Amino acid sequence: MEDVISLSRYFVENDTTIVDIGCSTGKLTKAMIEYNQDHCNNASWIGVEIADGFVDDLKKRYEEITKKDKTIDVEFIMEDIRDFEFEECSLVTSIFTLQFMPKKDRKEVISNIYRGLHDGGAFIFSEKTICENALVQDMITFNYYDYKRKTFTTEDIMDKERTLRHMMKPNTWEEISDMLCEAGFSNIQPFWRNHAFVGAIAIK
């Protein structure tokens, strides 16, 4: 998340909108506001979340932000990102969110993001990916399990795996890159990788 916050400074502009897709508790949104407030105090910040379980957290986060500075234009909305209209955006972020969407819906959302960005605006995102080669996929998966066992029990790991198995719809990096290109992005660059996870930036 620190990379996303620091990269945001290159794109956030006054009189534009910044959208945080799948904002959950609003932690990233708040951090980006604070990081950019010294040079950009007239932007609109929108956190979009679909899960009702975050309503109370987002109310508290809104109060935290506006208590410090009532002039900050920020809102958290409960909405399916597939129905959201991106307008006048300088930056859109998505941290491990689009990977839960079917490919068709993901392509449509990425196209909507591209159309809603200013020229020079950016889409910064992170996703879990899968490998094209089954052997490499197994190696990365088991290596990740070994890493997780340092903190969690095997039972905890497998319970989470079973929970996410039918919810997550990961793609290969090549498929993700193709979706971005089809939407119109021509400048696409990964900036972070860890096991099967990747963070990348796509600039319009």
Residue positions per predicted region:
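Conserved beta-strand signature within the Rossmann-like core of class I S-adenosyl-L-methionine
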Residues: 120-128
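Class I SAM-dependent methyltransferase SAM/SAH-binding core
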Residues: 19, 24-82
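C-terminal alpha-helical "lid/dimerization" subdomain adjacent to the S-adenosyl-L-methionine
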Residues: 128-182
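Conserved alpha-helix/loop element of class I SAM-dependent methyltransferases that forms part
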Residues: 1-14
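Core SAM-dependent methyltransferase catalytic element
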Residues: 186-204
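Short conserved loop adjoining the S-adenosyl-L-methionine
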Residues: 83-87
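A conserved beta-strand element that flanks and buttresses the S-adenosyl-L-methionine
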Residues: 93
